Amino acid sequence: MENQAHIAGEKKGIMEKIKEKLPGGHGDHKETAGTHGHPGTATHGAPATGGAYGQQGHAGTTGTGLHGAHAGEKKGVMENIKDKLPGGHQDHQQTGGTYGQQGHTGTATHGTPATGGTYGQQGHTGTATHGTPATGGTYGEQGHTGVTGTGTHGTGEKKGVMENIKEKLPGGHGDHQQTGGTYGQQGHTGTATHGTPAGGGTYEQHGHTGMTGTGTHGTGEKKGVMENIKDKLPGGHGDHQQTGGTYGQQGHTGTATQGTPAGGGTYEQHGHTGMTGAGTHSTGEKKGVMENIKEKLPGGHSDHQQTGGAYGQQGHTGTATHGTPAGGGTYGQHGHAGVIGTETHGTTATGGTHGQHGHTGTTGTGTHGSDGIGEKKSLMDKIKDKLPGQH
């Protein structure tokens, strides 16, 4: 189903464009229906294999994209959230989960194998672009979301509050690999771009978020308060590696760009945040209060290494720039914060293990050409925008 909005100025409803552009591939496709009422959709020579043994509501979409969608469409709140997720044009492969999955959605573009989880997963979503294998978790995962390598370039649309929060999370341009967690994860989100393996946690992770290599390029959009908080977190353009924590993590966030392995903690981590290599390029946007708080944290250009503590750390912070290894403490540390190396290249940010709480690892975020371009900033805009700026 190809929906290419070539005619500008179309007035559309709220729910009309949420799913109308998901499948839009152009090539040879192979569709293999699953067993036990399993729908599978594949484009571009991509084998979409449905799950087996009692799966329900499994949706497999491969090779969807927006082609020549002219700006100027009047859209609602929820219209642009998912309309730009996949846009690849190559061979894809998607394999559905097995054994009792529910609500599984796998979207893969550009030769990307998106493999669904196995054994009782619910609400699993895997999206991968540009040769990226997105592998879902196994054994009872719930709410797993994998978004890889989607982005918008020069859109210029006037959008609402929630429209731009997730539409630009992935914007990488390379081979990616995303591996979901295993054994009872909930709310797991893994995003990887540019050949970046984003490994999800295992054994009962909750709220795991992995964002890698997303960015906006010359958008020029007028955005609200919450629109730019997350749209510029990842913006790297290289090979990345992200490894999620294992064994009962909650609220784990790992973001890695430019060959930077950001290793999440293991064994019951909470609120772990790892951000690597996010940046904006010549945006020139009018921003609100909270938009610029995190967009300029790191801006350096060297190799860095950060190693989180192990065994029950809380609030771990380690700051290291220019090849400096900042080793976190072990066994029950509190209030430790780790910001490493702005615009990192080959930087290794390793999260703590065994019961860490509130671990924050930020590696390699930076802005390029966003200074002195007429941005209107508020009270909290410049609090952290100049922390790391080594070049």
UniProtKB/Swiss-Prot annotation:
Residues 21-391 are annotated as: Disordered. Residues 9-391 are annotated as: 6 X 23 AA approximate repeats. InterPro entries: Dehydrin, Dehydrin_CS. One of its GO terms (biological process) is response to water deprivation. It comes from the Eukaryota. Residues 34-59, 93-145, 177-196, 241-260, 272-282, 305-324, 333-351 have a biased composition (Low complexity). Residues 361-372 have a biased composition (Gly residues). Residues 21-33, 70-92, 155-176, 219-240, 283-304, 373-391 have a biased composition (Basic and acidic residues). Induction: Specifically induced by cold temperatures. Sequence repeats lie at residues 9-31, 49-62, 72-94, 95-108, 115-128, 135-148, 156-178, 179-192, 199-212, 220-242, 243-256, 263-276, 284-306, 307-320, 327-340, 350-363, 374-391. PANTHER family: DEHYDRIN XERO 1, DEHYDRIN XERO 2-RELATED. Contains 6 A-type repeats and 11 B-type repeats similar to those found in maize, rice and barley dehydrin and rab proteins. Belongs to the plant dehydrin family. This is Cold-shock protein CS120. The lineage of its organism: Eukaryota, Viridiplantae, Streptophyta, Embryophyta, Tracheophyta. The gene is CS120.
